[in-house]
Each structure stands twice: as structure tokens, then as C-alpha cells.
């Protein structure tokens, strides 16, 4: 399985919070961030602020195989609206996926597309209900370049976090004696020295989200409530190895 499709809950929370923050500037927007393995379309990652039921039904039924938006996006490199031409061209106007969409008050939308270097189809779909079509359409048209850049930037963060997860697992396999991976230890060490997440990210040349991801793993490993408890316990039990600056 490709590294992006492990559906790590911590990573999904981080990515969702980044989309929530980035898209909040444009109003009350419902969105779905989707990553599809083009070589193996059953592998799919969906992060959304829409109803969990919608996402669960979509994934359980593998609706990506019949979704007109996905089918259209496979052959596009620029953003596109969900219009009548899309429905006609895919010949799926009465498909199950549109029945599902109507049930969850999704009547229109706009999708931003990215084809990444790992052969994944990456989409950010803005979902629009009937009561807010004109307002959201105007916002999207005025900010298409910014929304496309948002997708590119946050997808790069997704890739970075999953690479760190894989590296973390490899570190654990290579050194079973240490409770923390090399990266976790580095982050915990600098945190114990009073550095903020932003400062640690600069020191280690990684993203702030990556720091938060590893701190989350440390908290789980130690069975404590939060990062402050983890740092204090790491110091008290001498679990943190010195790091050369």
C-alpha cells in the first residue's frame, strides 16, 4: 500500500485543521480533500468537514469508481465547476453518487486538481448547496489561484507527514531499545530545552505540522494527557537523549 493511504488519524487531524484554517477566510465552506492512487483506485484518502456519514458511505461503496467529478478530474489539470456539461460527458447524471449528494444537500461544486509525482490524483472539492450558490461561486471565481495554491501547499504537507511516519517506523525497527525514534527524540529534546514548535521546526528544517505529529506520537507512547506531561516525564525518567546542536 502506498504510504499516503494508511489513513493515520493524527495526520488527518493536522491536515483537516490546516484546510479548516485556510478555507475559513472564504466563509462557511464545505470541502472534501481527496487523494486517489491512479494505479490502484481502491486506495483513497478523504478528509472533509462535511458529514462523516457522507464520507463513510462514499468510501464503503468505492464511489470513486463512478463519481463524475473524479472521472472528469482524471483528464483535467485546471479547476472546473460541476455543471451540466460534466454530467452529460460522464453520462452519470442519475448515478448513485448524485443520489448520495442530494441526500446530503450537495447540489453544486467546484473542484481543484493536482496530479502529483507519485501518480496520485489530488482534488479539493468545494461543495455548494442550493441556498448559497451565487455567493460561493463569486468567492471561488475571485480566488481560484489562491485556492489552487492552498491545495498544492497542504498536499505537500500531507506527503511530508506520511514520509515522517514511514521514517519513524523504520527508526523504531532499527533500534528497538529506544522508546522514541530519532526524530521524536530530537523534537522532545528541543521541547525540553524550552523551544516552541515553530523554533523546533526551524532548527530541524521541518514543518510545524511535522513537529506536532511527532509530539502526538510521543504523548501516545507515554500514555500521558498532553505534550507538557510528556516532556516532564521524559526528563524525569531520563528517556531523552542529548542532541548535538
From Swiss-Prot:
Q: Which domain of life is it from?
A: Bacteria
- Entry keyword annotation includes Transcription regulation: yes
Name of this chain's protein = Transcriptional activator protein ExpR
Q: Extract the signal peptide range.
A: none
**Could you tell me which Pfam families the record lists for this protein?**
Autoind_bind (PF03472), GerE (PF00196)
Query: Which GO molecular-function terms appear in the entry?
Result: DNA binding
- Tell me where in this chain the HTH luxR-type domain is found: 173-238
Family as reported in the entry's similarity comment: Belongs to the autoinducer-regulated transcriptional regulatory protein family.
Q: What is the organism of origin for this protein?
A: Pectobacterium parmentieri
A GO BP entry is: quorum sensing
Q: Does the keyword DNA-binding apply?
A: yes
Which ranges of the sequence are annotated as binding DNA? Answer: 197-216
* Protein purpose: Functions as an OHLL responsive transcriptional regulator that acts in virulence (soft rot disease) through the activation of genes for plant tissue macerating enzymes.
The UniProt keyword set, sorted, is: Activator, DNA-binding, Quorum sensing, Transcription, Transcription regulation, Virulence
Amino acid at each position: 500500500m502506498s504510504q499516503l493511504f494508511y489513513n493515520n488519524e493524527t495526520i488527518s487531524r493536522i491536515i483537516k485543521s490546516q484546510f479548516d484554517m485556510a478555507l475559513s477566510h472564504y466563509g462557511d465552506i464545505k470541502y472534501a480533500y481527496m487523494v486517489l492512487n491512479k494505479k490502484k483506485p481502491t486506495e483513497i484518502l478523504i478528509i472533509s468537514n462535511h458529514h462523516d456519514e457522507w464520507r463513510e458511505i462514499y468510501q464503503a461503496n468505492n464511489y470513486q469508481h463512478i463519481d463524475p467529478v473524479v472521472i472528469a478530474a482524471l483528464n483535467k489539470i485546471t479547476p472546473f465547476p460541476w455543471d451540466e456539461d460534466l454530467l452529460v460527458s460522464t453520462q452519470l447524471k442519475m448515478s448513485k453518487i448524485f443520489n448520495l449528494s442530494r441526500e446530503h444537500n450537495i447540489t453544486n461544486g467546484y473542484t481543484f486538481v493536482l496530479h502529483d509525482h507519485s501518480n496520485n490524483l489530488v482534488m479539493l472539492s468545494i461543495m455548494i448547496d442550493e441556498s448559497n450558490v451565487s455567493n460561493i461561486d463569486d468567492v471561488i471565481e475571485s480566488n481560484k489561484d489562491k485556492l489552487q495554491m492552498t491545495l498544492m501547499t497542504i498536499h505537500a504537507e500531507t506527503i511530508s507527514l506520511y514520509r515522517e511516519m514511514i521514517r519513524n517506523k523504520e527508526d523504531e525497527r532499527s533500534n528497538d531499545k529506544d522508546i522514541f525514534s530519532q526524530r521524536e527524540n530530537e523534537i522532545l529534546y528541543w521541547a525540553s530545552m524550552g523551544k516552541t514548535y515553530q523554533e523546533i521546526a526551524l532548527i530541524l528544517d521541518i514543518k510545524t505540522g511535522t513537529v506536532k505529529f511527532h509530539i502526538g506520537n510521543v504523548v501516545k507512547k507515554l500514555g500521558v494527557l498532553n505534550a507538557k506531561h510528556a516532556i516532564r516525564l521524559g526528563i524525569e525518567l531520563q528517556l531523552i537523549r542529548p542532541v548535538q546542536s
